[in-house]
């Protein structure tokens, strides 16, 4: 849902009617990854490359390169690190959420559904990190301390957290909400932050 929203303003114009409001999944099954790559390759070769436009031939090559890379790296899934101090989940998720534009009222509903899935997503990350630890691949103590500090900094923002203020700003910018609706959505947003997002950060620590 996040990537789609940032890529297409109106996905329905491209025949995409709906997408699940989720961040994605933390994948650890090597065989599942390889099977997924194989299925995508089968779909890709149904297109005759020499009959595509130059632009689409480039897209074809990019997709093929991506699939080749995904297949080669499938056996190294446990070496991934979703909690990096610069581009980790704990630092990037609030930024991505705060920049999620509301073109229609439905976008705010999707956004709130996405926020509600934060707990499940973080639980997947936690399970992944435990798996890394069991395999002797856990991050260094210094990095772990830095991640904990970043999570604490997010929690310490309290009511000053920009996920509160930017939510209201985005509703105003869209011009799609009445004052009454903005009040209702603002309450829902605050509730999700307090009951789902913040507890997820606490568990991550």
Could you say what each language-model-derived stretch is?
Residues 1-205:
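N-terminal maturation segment of proteins
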């Amino acid at each position: 849902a996040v990537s789609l929203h940032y890529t297409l303003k109106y996905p329905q114009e491209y025949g995409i009617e709906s997408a699940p409001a989720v961040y994605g999944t933390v994948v650890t099954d090597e065989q599942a990854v390889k099977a997924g790559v194989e299925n995508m390759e089968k779909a890709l070769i149904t297109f005759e490359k020499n009959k595509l436009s130059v632009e689409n031939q480039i897209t074809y090559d990019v997709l093929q390169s991506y699939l080749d890379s995904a297949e080669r790296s499938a056996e190294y899934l446990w070496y991934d690190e979703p909690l990096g101090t610069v581009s980790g989940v704990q630092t990037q998720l609030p930024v991505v959420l705060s920049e999620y534009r509301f073109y229609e009222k439905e976008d705010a509903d999707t956004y709130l559904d996405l926020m509600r899935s934060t707990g499940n997503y973080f639980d997947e990350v936690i399970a992944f990190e435990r798996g890394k630890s069991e395999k002797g691949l856990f991050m260094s103590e210094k990095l772990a301390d830095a991640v904990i500090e970043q999570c604490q900094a997010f929690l310490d923002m309290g009511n000053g957290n920009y996920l509160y203020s930017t939510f209201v700003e985005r509703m105003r910018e869209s011009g799609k909400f009445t004052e009454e609706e903005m009040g209702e959505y603002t309450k829902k947003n605050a509730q999700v932050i307090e009951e789902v997002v913040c507890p997820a950060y606490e568990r991550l620590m």
